[in-house]
Each structure stands twice: as C-alpha cells, then as structure tokens.
C-alpha cells in the first residue's frame, strides 16, 4: 500500500479537515457579494487540500528527508561550486535592520543597507580588478546579459554599430551563447584546443570589425588556466572588441590573480557560487557585473554613491543601459556575501588555494581507474572521461546513478561537450580530506563493480526513493502540474 507520505498533499486531502482554528467572530458577518460586485468574484471553489496540522507537518518533513544538499552531504557538482554556506551569513541576513526594511523607504531611513551595498560594490570590484560593480542582476545568466548590454552600449556610443557579433569558444558555459542571442548579438563559435583552451588561430580567423567582444571563462570549463590570456586580450582589443569574463570559476583565483589584470573589461560574478550564498531550488541568486573605468557610465541605474557621509541612489546617468531589475538586486543574498567577505578578508586567497588543492588531490587519486583526458595540474575542478577500461555498455550515466546508492549527489556529467563521457568534479575548499577520501573510495568501488557486475550499474540506483526514470520521456512529456481526476 502506498504510504501517505509518498503522495502529493492533494492526494491525502479529506473534506472537512483543517490545520487551523479561529476565534469566534466578534463583528457582524456580512455576505461577500454585498462588499464586492459579483462580476469580480470567482464562481469556482478554491481547490486547496484539506488536511490536519499533523498531516502537514509529517508530509513536508518526509519531503525534506528526501532532499539532498550541502548541509546533508558532499556535493561535487562541477561548474557549480557547491560549497558550504556558513550559518553566520544567515544570522546577519535576518537582522531586523536588514530584514524589516522596504525598498520604497526614503534613502535617509535605509542608510545602513545602502552603505553595505556600496562597500560590497567596492570589495567585489577590488577582488576582480574592476572599477565599479552593479549589484542588480538576479543571477549569473542575468549578469551575462547585463554585461553584454554594457558592451553593446559602449560600441553604440562610439558609433560603431556594425559590431554585432560575439565570439564564444565551444567549451563555454551553455548560458553564454543564449545570453548573447538575447542581447541581440550573433554568435561566432570557435573551436577549442583539446585541453579546452582557446585556439589562437581560430580566434584570429574569427576577429573582424564586426566583433563586439569575446566571452571567456578562466580557468576554463575543464578547470585549466588559460595560459595565453594576455595574447588573447591583446588580439581582441587590437581588433576593437571587449573581453568578457564569465565569473563561474572565480573560486579558483581569488587573491591570486584578477580578471582585470588579465585584460578583461567586463565581468560577472556568481555570488551564489564564489561567496557562499545558498543556491539551487530556483534561487534567489545574484550576479553582480563589474566594468573597467571607461565603462562605468553604462552600468544600470541607479548606482549607489557616497556624498559626504550620506549614501544616495544616483539616477542621473545619461548613458546607462537603464534599470534591469526591480529595486536594487537580491538584497538578502548581498548581505550574506558581504558577511562572507568580511569573515575571510585577505584569507580569500586561502579559500581558492584549498579549492585547487582539493581538486588536484582528488584528480590524482582517481586517475588510476578513470580516464583523465588532460594530465596536468588543474585549478578548482577537473574532468574525467569515464572509466579507464572500456567496459562494454557501462556509461558515465550508469556511474552517476550508482553513486546515488552510495549516498552521494553525482558530479556534473556529459559536460563539457568536448570530452566524451565527461564527469566534471568540483570539491570546493570546504571539504575535509576524510570526506574526499570517502567519495574517492566510492567511485573506485564503482569502477570495480563495473568490471565484476556491470548490470549492477546499468540498473542503478537501487536504494533511492525514485529509481531510474525515462529521461527522454520526461523531457518530451513534461508534467509539472497536478490536476484532479475528473
């Protein structure tokens, strides 16, 4: 028999049950139609579940026990930086002076919030080697869009309207070409070298007076540093373009080097990656965008400025791309990031150094049984290409599904696309060597199982709440809304 707690809450609803009690009404009751015209009232009952309080508590507690996150276990999702989120950050975000304010309040009544955002702007700019930031973008892809809009505004002010193309390597994040298209650019894809680095000859052949810029991640999606970055920056700038930094992998280089020093002109951060704010489940995230000095005038309005001892919202920006989000960004997330940066200070460099150390440790321990396509020192993450031995029918997907039986969230699989059977692993700096060893041991045991009992992997997972689903059918026939049977 199906447990009530494996059902939707609508399925355990029983007419007449309720999870609340109200005091006896002490005012005269009136008919709703006497207050609101009938044409504005729905003629349908609200189809809400009728459940008791204990049913509500048990239902959602059971659901929470089925979840997996950084608070419950190791989460090595490559290109996502699933680091632990310190609870001090949460404490600061719910302080009454931050949690109980409203963006419609007069500036003089929210000086603390404006001061925090102004200082965070300066901190993030310093880490990236930029002049100023905007904190408005909601997340990474939104930040990409804003950065590309800044690039477009720059060329427009110069009267260089023929620059309608953005160069993007084939190893780039999938959001890069999507963001470029939404910003109104045509995408020019160039081939990467086998190690994921930019192919200089391909770049040279793509550059022209129609190129607005190049979008690049450094370290690359394969977790390797772009050693030719100075040459790349010079080539793009000599051709009249701008260099855009996708900050997805900033966790590898904080305090070690800065995108601005490499020659990048525009950058976005993923606050929810690098600066330890919660992510997953749809947000909220945060994707601040930074620019070099001559691009500041194009940043979204308003920009927070300090005049004397007062912080103000500056809307007088004739060349601004305009407002790109309601109000001023995801403020609660910004409080968490500000707390994180204050907590670490100069030790942000150690964050990146340990992230790199952890990744290299794992890579070294796993390369005996898993194929390592590029054998060199990595940065914060690395990419494996399936098992070292070609075991008929055992795929990276099978390995990932079997990891679920060992109690782990799998790494990113089949990305980047330039590596066959790719597994992208990013341990982050917050994990101990004991945790890393346990995960390494699980992966190595799975490699042994693949040789001895391959069917165990092909039919995995065996012990999860949901077994292997038909992913093709799920993609083609997506049902995300419950409807009552007629």
Curated annotation (Swiss-Prot):
Protein task: The glycine cleavage system catalyzes the degradation of glycine. The P protein binds the alpha-amino group of glycine through its pyridoxal phosphate cofactor; CO(2) is released and the remaining methylamine moiety is then transferred to the lipoamide cofactor of the H protein.
GO molecular function, one term: glycine binding
A GO cellular-component term linked to this record: cytosol
GO biological process: glycine decarboxylation via glycine cleavage system
The keyword Hydrolase belongs to this UniProt entry's keyword annotation: no
Reported cofactor(s): pyridoxal 5'-phosphate
Residues the record lists as N6-(pyridoxal phosphate)lysine modifications: 273
EC code: 1.4.4.2
Keyword Oxidoreductase attributed: yes
Keywords assigned: Oxidoreductase, Pyridoxal phosphate
Organism ancestry: Bacteria, Bacillati, Bacillota, Clostridia, Peptostreptococcales
Catalytic activity: N(6)-[(R)-lipoyl]-L-lysyl-[glycine-cleavage complex H protein] + glycine + H(+) = N(6)-[(R)-S(8)-aminomethyldihydrolipoyl]-L-lysyl-[glycine-cleavage complex H protein] + CO2
Protein name (Swiss-Prot/TrEMBL): Probable glycine dehydrogenase (decarboxylating) subunit 2
Organism for this UniProt entry: Alkaliphilus oremlandii (strain OhILAs)
One Pfam family per UniProt: GcvP2_C
Similarity-based family: Belongs to the GcvP family. C-terminal subunit subfamily.
InterPro entries linked to this entry: GcvPB, GDC-P_C, GDC-P_N, GDC_P, PyrdxlP-dep_Trfase, PyrdxlP-dep_Trfase_major, PyrdxlP-dep_Trfase_small
Assembly and interaction partners: The glycine cleavage system is composed of four proteins: P, T, L and H. In this organism, the P 'protein' is a heterodimer of two subunits.
EC category: oxidoreductase
Source organism superkingdom: Bacteria
């Amino acid at each position: 028999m199906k447990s009530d707690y494996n059902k939707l809450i609508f399925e355990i609803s029983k007419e007449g049950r309720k999870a609340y009690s109200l005091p006896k009404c002490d005012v005269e009751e009136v008919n709703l139609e006497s207050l609101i015209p009938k044409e504005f009232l729905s003629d349908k009952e609200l189809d809400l579940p009728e459940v008791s309080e204990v049913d509500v508590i048990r239902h959602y507690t059971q659901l929470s026990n089925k979840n997996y996150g950084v608070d419950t276990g190791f989460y090595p999702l490559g290109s996502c930086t699933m680091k632990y989120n310190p609870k001090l950050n949460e404490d600061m975000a719910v302080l009454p002076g931050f949690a109980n304010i409203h963006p419609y309040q007069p500036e003089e009544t929210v000086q603390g919030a404006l001061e925090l955002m102004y200082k965070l702007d300066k901190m993030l700019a310093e880490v990236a080697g930029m002049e100023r930031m905007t904190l408005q973008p909601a997340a990474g892809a939104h930040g990409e869009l804003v950065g590309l809009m800044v690039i477009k505004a720059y060329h427009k002010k110069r009267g260089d309207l023929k620059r309608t193309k953005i160069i993007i390597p084939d190893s780039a994040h999938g959001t890069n070409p999507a963001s470029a298209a939404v910003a109104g650019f045509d995408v020019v894809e160039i081939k990467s070298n086998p190690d994921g680095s930019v192919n200089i000859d391909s770049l040279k052949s793509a550059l022209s007076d129609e190129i607005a810029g190049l979008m690049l991640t450094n370290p690359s999606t394969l977790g390797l540093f772009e050693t030719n970055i100075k040459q790349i920056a010079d080539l793009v700038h000599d051709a009249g373009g701008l260099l855009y930094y996708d900050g997805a992998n900033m966790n590898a280089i904080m305090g070690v080097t800065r995108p601005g020093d490499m020659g990048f002109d525009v950058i976005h951060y993923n606050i929810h990656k690098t600066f330890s704010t919660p992510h997953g489940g749809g947000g909220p995230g945060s994707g601040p965008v930074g620019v070099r000095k001559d691009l500041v005038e194009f940043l979204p309005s308003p920009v927070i400025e300090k005049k004397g001892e007062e912080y103000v919202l500056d809307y007088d920006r004739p060349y601004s791309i305009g407002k790109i989000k309601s109000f001023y960004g995801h403020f609660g997330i910004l409080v968490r990031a500000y707390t994180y940066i204050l907590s670490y200070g100069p030790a942000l460099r150690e964050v990146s150094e340990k992230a790199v150390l952890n990744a290299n440790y794992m890579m070294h321990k796993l390369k005996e049984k898993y194929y390592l396509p590029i054998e060199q020192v990595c940065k914060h993450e690395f990419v494996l290409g399936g098992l070292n031995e070609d075991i008929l029918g055992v795929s990276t997907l099978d390995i990932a599904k079997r990891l679920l039986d060992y109690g782990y969230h799998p790494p990113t699989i089949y990305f980047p696309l330039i590596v066959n059977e790719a597994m992208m692993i990013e341990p982050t700096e917050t994990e101990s060597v004991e945790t890393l060893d346990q995960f390494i041991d699980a992966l190595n045991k799975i490699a042994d199982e693949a040789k001895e009992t391959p069917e165990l992997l092909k039919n995995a997972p065996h012990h999860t709440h949901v077994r292997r689903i038909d992913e093709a059918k799920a993609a083609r026939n997506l049902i995300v809304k419950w409807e009552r049977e007629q």
